[in-house]
Amino acid sequence: MGDVKNFLYAWCGKRKMTPSYEIRAVGNKNRQKFMCEVRVEGYNYTGMGNSTNKKDAQSNAARDFVNYLVRINELKSEEVPAVGVAPPTPSATDSSDTTAEDGGVPGNLGGPLPPHLTLQAENNSGGGGSGYVPTWDRGANLKDYYSRKEEQEVQATLESEEVDLNAGLHGNWTLENAKARLNQYFQKEKIQGEYKYTQVGPDHNRSFIAEMTIYIKQIGRRIFAREHGSNKKLAAQSCALSLVRQLYHLGVIEPYSGLTKKKEGETVEPYKVNLSQDLEHQLQNIVQELNLEIVPIPEDPSVPVALNLGKLAQFEPSQRQNPVGVVPWSPPQSNWNPWTSSNIDEGPLAYATPEQISMDLKNELMYQLEQDRDLQAVLQERELLPVKKFESEILEAISQNPVVIIRGATGCGKTTQVPQFILDDCIQNDRAAECNIVVTQPRRISAVSVAERVAYERGEEPGKSCGYSVRFESILPRPHASIMFCTVGVLLRKLEAGIRGISHVIVDEIHERDINTDFLLVVLRDVVQAYPEVRIVLMSATIDTSMFCEYFFNCPIIEVYGRTFPVQEYFLEDCIQMTHFVPPPKDKKKKDKDDDGGEDDDANCNLICGDEYGAETRISMAQLNEKETPFELIEALLLYIETLNVPGAVLVFLPGWNLIYTMQKHLEMNPHFGSHRYQILPLHSQIPREEQRKVFDPVPSGVTKIILSTNIAETSITINDVVYVIDSCKQKVKLFTAHNNMTNYATVWASKTNLEQRKGRAGRVRPGFCFHLCSRARFERLETHMTPEMFRTPLHEIALSIKLLRLGGIGQFLAKAIEPPPLDAVIEAEHTLRELDALDANDELTPLGRILAKLPIEPRFGKMMIMGCIFYVGDAICTISAATCFPEPFISEGKRLGYIHRNFAGNRFSDHVALLSVFQAWDDARMGGEEAEIRFCEHKRLNMATLRMTWEAKVQLKEILINSGFPEECLLTQVFTNTGPDNNLDVVISLLAFGVYPNVCYHKEKRKILTTEGRNALIHKSSVNCPFSSQDMKYPSPFFVFGEKIRTRAISAKGMTLVTPLQLLLFASKKVQSDGQLVLVDDWIRLQISHEAAACITALRAAMEALVVEVTKQPGIISQLDPVNERMLNTIRQISRPSAAGINLMIGTTRYGDGPRPPKMARYDNGSGYRRGGSSYSGGGYGLGGYGTGGYGGGGGYGGRGGYSGGGYGGGSNSFRGSYVGGGGGVGGGGGGFRGLSRGGYRGMSGGDYRGESGGGYRGSGGFQRGGGRGGYGGGYFGQGRGGGGY
């Protein structure tokens, strides 16, 4: 194989060029591979190869590049050394050959040149379609913006009016001054600007969306803004702000030059920080050791000084990439597996020719068609699908055009059949080795269920000619002549290796317009211009596809007619009339203050009812609140359906998991629907696959299946036995407002397109019925389409993907989107990534940015996880990060959590610690098998599905970090205690403060808190910190960090964790100033702390950031840090202790005294405590050998014999980590250290190990959390026998 490398060198040498090879190791130490990329100047292609050794990886990369040169006619195939793989001859045709004869062969990867390719001369060998940009650059003229960018250096922090975290980026235009400037602009340009308002959410949680599009004649294009606010005024202000900021970045208007008159929020009293002398000395010493210069005390207190140090270490700026990149594509090749993105270096396929592969696969298929009776029966079923009549037309269009759109009604069979038409056509025409098809689906359940269906139709199990790949689960098909179904997100992650070895990309459900699909369409549009031989098939429901057709150069559209059976649809007034429904009397229960509705000035369409309906119907309809989902009416419809005596499943569309769960419980409580005659199944993306699968299973005769689903069942998945659809006409969307970092989950009206899709789900087996729970008048007012997700979500993650795939500038790339996002959102994303050190001075990915781009999590959490690895608490940080992707695991009857859930927080006053404790306890419980896991979740009222999904996500995050080179030791699972001192947990909370910044708040009284700049908010009712009643609460520290701000009628903070002021100074602040007496954090928190101490802590943050820079360049150094960095980490551990700031967490243990005593725990096996012997929550009660006798330090205390610090956490060796390894009794309990090799260590060999065999150890006698007798945590689960307490 080495010959091909020399061949490429020689070929380049003749042209005075040198191929440039870049090799990197991928995978972890145990199964390391080498990835090689080769580039040649002047060619917009990257050759790629990989192997278990560097030499073969280089040869494979050279081979890939040489095959590319053959495809573009720079080389003849017979000139290439023939070892290994010869490029497939049919696909090696000249890409510029326009002869009709070549194009006439179905599926030939040449074909006549489409008109758009005449534009390619401008694109410099197809670099991403800049020639076509004017048509689609609908957003902003980014060239002007980027050319002036250097002059307008951004100001990171600013003092602005309403909470505005980033006005300095946008010419200091804020909520307060933008609307007036927009009006001036309208007057000057004689524009009639009108806001279009939409109301979202129910009355008690109502908010508004304002949107506007304006034409800017100076630059000859339109700009668009769509923003959200809790009332019309705020929504309009936010919309005006987005428009003005875009005008500023386009150079149409000036920056704001007036003073931003600070609208004073509530002031926070100065907080006295009690710092010990010892810690101050320690801080000064470490700062000296690190050679950090701290800012001296200001001479004049009226002129405060900034304490923040600049960056101490920066990533070397990498070379700027070509202005426009394109994802590399190559046709299928014999020794390349496209599904694993790796070369096949071993086995028969490594040396098989394309002709051999094609012949073998054709023979296999022909034999199967002749011999398999079941397959013949399935083929007859397939013949009946409407799409079958269009097979030859579809194949002809795909053969002749790089892009084809197929539009077909729900259930016509396009999703399952089109990929099979292409595959079978290739196999039967001896071109099997040239065919690999990837099909994207918007959701995991659709990818898996469609793959399983296609495998069944082919008489196979998944993994042969058909497979799937979704997050957490893959069954990959064979490397040639196969179909892979995957989610769009999975395909985007695969693009890093290019679209290599794939002949056809099919994008299903393009009308959904999620951010990933829109992103993929931009990538594919560029790919198809650079590589016209690739085939792109876009599939959509029966909606207007003209926008997609125009976007893809007026490509052909094939219309597939024929839904199986007609569906009769009814609206709210019809439903009320046919069921004689009378709404129950309204609940007079007083609403909580923050849930109060206000004046509703949006028309109530339930008051509009045609004359053809009776008076009773009109009265009943007027009594129903449009914004709420009427459960009683759904019940009435279910009873009505029963009277029709037409068997079939009922599919009920509801917005969001909460309503599905509540509706399921509501129906199950009803003796009629809770009986064996009904099977009620939830369907939601967050429930496990095995639960999701149940909806496809047939039910016995006489049983009615009721499926309660979100819009997941709207597209792709087809549940064959559905005859009835009850449609709430709503859906839940996440709205994000960048200028104040506010998230809002709003229930909004679905679009007409959504309703059409939902209706189509009925009528698969017989004529169907669809009941829309909105009035005809409301239906007329619905939007035709939903707003694209790209307009209502932060763009940080997509921006990282653009850089990872080398697609050029973030803004320039997004300007090519089918509907580009507003320019101000793009600039926000770039700024955030620069601040995180993910982008360097040339706006290219840094080593840190490269890792963040690979983590499927918010970039800030990604950096927090890397810091967690440095402190050896990576596992806990991964758990918390994973948990943020899913709903809380608590099943709560009311809005507030009960004691059974609050107790998981121990005395840490933290929702995040509660999540960590729940996860830890569940992980322990499931060691006893599935039954123990189920019992534990039922007893603790926890959602087992959520916990399992969190585990999957955590494992995935850890694997990515390990594959990036982080040592496995820094990601080992640890046990935390939430009721006593635990320095590792202190560090986790410090890092969490970094991860959720700028979400910091200060507790005032009861539920009231102040957020950034002293704005009022409330503690969210689902928090462990939410008081039970109006009684006031005192917390050990008034400072909290929180996960997100949720806008209901008031603003509330969700996911709260108590922190100390030192943790804020260290990790949750951007601007720290001192006047010598007081320290001001982010312009609103005032701390009484010595200037020197504050300056030292702030300097440590800079030193920590510098360490992150070094670690991300070479993650392996974590296990061998130099002594100075070790001491710095130890100092940060000290600062993270609550006691370092004079805070005693023990004070608050009776904070829940305004309610009943916590219930006693039920027995599990022996004993009765939740954790080991005794009768209460903490083994022997809070008094007996728990907290009391022996206490933290003495015998029989908290940590087992010898107590928490007898023999000690630090005992034995000289540094922090020394205690893990040795010393008389560390965390591991009696004798032996955390990982001591004798007597009861964490993984001790003799006196009881991790799962102690012979008494003791982590869960054995005298183990981590218990003094005396046998049975530690599991008391017998893993110790000897099942004695002495435990579950």
Curated annotation (Swiss-Prot):
Region described as Necessary for interaction with RNA polymerase II holoenzyme: 252-661
GO CC terms of this entry: actin cytoskeleton; centrosome; CRD-mediated mRNA stability complex; cytoplasm; cytoplasmic ribonucleoprotein granule; nuclear body; nuclear stress granule; nucleolus
Annotated region described as Necessary for interaction with H2AX, given as residue ranges: 310-949
PROSITE patterns: DEAH_ATP_HELICASE, DS_RBD, HELICASE_ATP_BIND_1, HELICASE_CTER
Domain (Helicase C-terminal): residue spans on this chain: 633-806
Residue ranges of the region described as OB-fold: 955-1071
Binding of ATP, residues: G408, A409, T410, G411, C412, G413, K414, T415, T416
Low complexity composition bias: residue spans: 91-103
Location of this chain's protein in the cell: Nucleus; Nucleus, Nucleoplasm; Nucleus, Nucleolus; Cytoplasm
The name this protein goes by in its record: ATP-dependent RNA helicase A
Species of provenance: Bos taurus
Gene: DHX9
